[in-house]
Amino acid sequence: MTATLYCYFKIESDHDAVRGRLAALQAELAAAGWPGQLLRRCDDADTWMEVYPDIADREAFRAAWLPARRRRDLTMPVHEEWFQQI
């Protein structure tokens, strides 16, 4: 069964620079077969979320995602939530 990752975090500095680094991260992951979305809260422009649906192998995804975040200096604390279909 596949799962969807919802990863949310706060952005407290240059939104444009962080958005560019996140776009590069998501392009790399999409090329590896894990397309994602970048969202932000409607009522808080500093709270953002990455969403990656249909992850078949969570450990393989995390083994690619976490180092890719570090390479792009996306080291802010994040909250990972994994959901699957009922």
State each model region's role:
Residues M1-A63, L74, E80-I86:
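Short S/T/G/P-rich N-terminal loop/turn motif that feeds into the first structured element of a domain
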Residues R69-R71:
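Short, exposed beta-strand-loop hairpins at the edges of beta-sheets
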